[in-house]
Design a protein with these regions (language model features):
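Terminal, contiguous helix-loop blocks that mediate binding/assembly
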Residues: 145, 149-151, 165-205, 210-646
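C-terminal motif of bacterial Sec signal peptides marking the signal peptidase cleavage site
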Residues: 4-6
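Bacterial signal peptide processing site
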Residues: 8-11
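Structural recognition of the beta-strand scaffold that forms the well-ordered cores
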Residues: 28-33, 86-91, 157-161, 201-205, ...
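Residue-level signal for functionally critical sites in structured catalytic/ligand-binding pockets
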Residues: 39-41, 60-74, 163-167, 175-177, ...
Length: 646
């Protein structure tokens, strides 16, 4: 065998070897992981700690899964890449033996701690703090101060908050805290950062609803970029094998470029889509642009004319909403760009100021993406101007005092309305075949006129089952389509078909007609509906996605709780119904004599087989009517419209 070499080849090999072994710039990644019920109440989700039910260690938990993903990523890296990553995780805040208090661990410790698949029972931790409330400002400040020596050695610095998020109401719910409703408020977050004197290149939130201007307003002095979601997140959150790998493989990228890769990973990679759930949004923000945007919003609020409340209301209601819970009638936030564009159209006298704010907003949003269920999620949200959320939205939460004053005037103006909407019924008839029908986009239906002194918040067609001559069980709704004519709406004829949920075969198994109230349209033209239910006795908002052929293409449930002070705490978890689950829906029931609407629990359906969806004719007495509601909640109903059974 003859080997031929050349000096040039040897030089190339040596150069390549030097390139491969050359040290990479140091990157610090810190994770503040408040385990909460995402870690200690994994399955079954019932409010009881898993280890209490099992009377022993539980290897399940969303935090555990993500720590395992970090370990898996780290073990695939080269020695040079490992040397360049300085990873510190503060984890705890959950009702598990290994997660009580707080433990600080680097990657070497996490690898060692993972050997028995149970985190929190080793002796390798950098620090271990007993009886620590991770939802406190002091706990966060302590971790930030611990990081300071390492931060000084790193060229890129990232901090990730992990847990439930409530936008301007805070992040991180420690389930071992004296109050299980405790979160790190924005004020506490600011205090912790101010006391520690640290600064990050990227501050990220693997938590729901945190891509709000209110959050950005608090953290902008302490980070250059922010990565967060406007909407709720899937229960599994981020896929940390991919997250750490992206940091390691892109050691020379600045945070703006790396942040874009993280956004794309969240929307595109199969591991981030493994639950098949909807409502995925993620955005990268340049925090140096926060102050100019807030200044532009201050100028805008001075130009808004509250004498024209109806267009103001329409601008809000037509905007993309986030963090909705129907029974409490709340939403946390709306998309800021969507609202500004709607406002510009609805109130021309404020259009110049709105355009200036839009220009500033464009500079703030470096990169933003969403799935097809949130077509108008553009990267940054702001308080929704929902009157039921206003008691929790004060100066500590607001982006500025002028904005808070604007929000207060908006809520006050709409809340003083005492007049009900008026629904014109000249096109109604109690017999379907005698109705005066019109058409809209090729569909036959009713053309209605609905008016209100301060504007309509929502107008919908409501479908009902007649329990008797007095009570109507509302099983669903569709939004009424506004026509070009002033105050005119269109409603299609209902043929009496509706959703059917069955335990296995719909011909032989137990079944029920679930309530499904229209929520939104996807970019594919699919309809999303929501309802309230108990899934395995836990309160959830239940979502359905239906295609144009009325087939259910996806379903998911988001657990929530209501705190003692009235906060609706929406979980990051998204659940799917399966065999073995029990499901019990809440129906809105209308008392036609008392003319009141109340919520009542329906029958419980326990699935012995795989749940099956159908869309079929209802073999019961049924009717529909039209409903209009203003901002204050004053509601008008049309006459009841009988559906004739074929």
């Amino acid at each position: 065998v003859l080997f031929l070499t050349s000096c040039h080849a040897a030089e190339s090999v040596n150069a390549l070897s030097e390139s491969v072994s050359a040290p990479l710039p140091k990157t610090l990644i810190a994770v503040y992981m408040v385990g909460g019920n995402l870690e200690d109440d994994a399955k079954p989700r019932n409010g009881i700690p898993d280890e209490q039910e099992m009377e022993g260690p539980s290897l399940k938990g969303a935090g555990t899964d993500d720590l395992k993903e970090m370990v898996a990523a780290y073990q695939t890296l080269s020695s040079v890449q490992k040397e360049a990553l300085d990873i510190h995780v503060a984890f705890g805040g959950a009702r598990k033996a290994g997660w009580k208090g707080t433990k600080y661990a680097d990657m070497a410790c996490l690898v060692q701690d993972s050997q028995d698949q149970y985190f929190g029972n080793d002796h390798c931790y950098q620090q271990q703090i007993e009886n620590n409330n991770m939802s406190s400002s002091e706990s966060l400040a302590a971790f930030l101060k611990f990081l300071k020596p390492s931060l000084s050695q790193a060229e890129r610095k990232a901090l990730i908050f992990w847990d439930h998020g409530l936008s301007y109401l805070g992040v991180g719910q420690d389930s071992t805290a004296p109050s299980s409703d405790d979160f790190i408020t924005l004020t506490e977050m600011k205090s912790a950062f101010s006391a520690s004197g640290v600064h990050f290149d990227l501050m990220a939130f693997d938590a729901c609803l945190m891509a709000s201007l209110e959050v950005a307003r608090v953290i902008y002095p302490y980070a250059r970029y922010m990565l967060a979601s406007e909407e709720l997140e899937p229960g599994h959150g981020w896929y940390y094998t991919d997250v750490l790998t992206l940091f390691a493989q892109n050691a020379h990228l600045d945070m703006a470029a790396l942040g874009k890769k993280l956004v794309d990973s969240y929307l595109d990679t199969p591991q981030h889509n493994r639950s098949k759930n909807k409502y995925k949004t993620l955005s990268l923000l340049d925090l140096e642009q926060v102050s100019p945007l807030i200044a532009a919003l201050t100028g805008l609020t001075a130009q808004i004319n509250f004498q024209k409340f109806e267009p103001l209301l329409q601008a809000v209601e037509n905007s993309q909403h986030f963090g909705k819970e129907p029974q409490s009638d709340i939403s946390y936030s709306i998309d800021l760009k969507d609202w500004l564009q709607n406002l510009k159209q609805k109130q021309p006298e404020a259009s110049v100021a709105a355009e200036q704010a839009l220009s500033r907003l464009q500079s703030l949003v470096v990169y933003a993406r969403h799935d097809d269920s949130k077509p108008n999620a553009n990267g940054v949200s702001i308080y929704s101007l929902n009157k039921n959320m206003k008691p929790q939205y004060g100066l500590e939460q607001a982006v500025s005092e002028p904005w808070l004053n604007f929000a207060g005037t908006f809520v006050s103006t709409g809340s003083h309305d005492q007049e009900k909407p008026v629904i014109s019924t000249e096109n109604f008839s109690l017999q379907q075949n005698a109705a005066k029908l019109c058409s809209y986009q090729g569909r036959q239906g009713h053309c209605l006129k609905i008016q209100d002194n301060l504007g309509i918040r929502e107008a919908e067609q409501v479908f009902a089952l007649k329990a008797d001559s007095r009570y109507l069980f509302l099983i669903g709704s569709e939004v009424l389509h506004p026509l070009e004519q002033n105050s005119q709406y269109f409603a299609p004829v209902w043929n009496g078909e509706w959703l059917l949920l069955c335990d296995g075969n719909c011909q032989t198994g137990l079944s029920l007609f679930p309530p499904a109230y229209f929520e939104a349209l996807t970019t594919q033209g699919h309809r999303i509906y929501s309802s309230e239910a108990l899934l395995n006795d836990e309160k959830v908002v239940f979502y359905l996605e239906m295609d144009a052929n009325n087939r259910v293409v996806s379903q998911w449930a988001i657990p929530y709780s209501v705190s003692q002070d009235g906060r609706v705490i929406l979980s990051r978890t998204q659940l799917n119904i399966a065999a073995g689950d029990s499901l019990q829906f809440f129906y809105q029931v209308y008392d036609t004599q008392a003319q009141v609407l109340v919520w009542k629990k329906g029958s419980q359906l326990r699935f012995g087989q795989t749940p099956v969806w159908d869309f079929a004719q209802i073999n019961a007495s049924k009717a529909y009517f039209f409903q209009a509601q203003d901002y204050q909640g004053n509601t008008s109903l049309s006459p009841l419209y009988e559906v004739q059974t074929n």
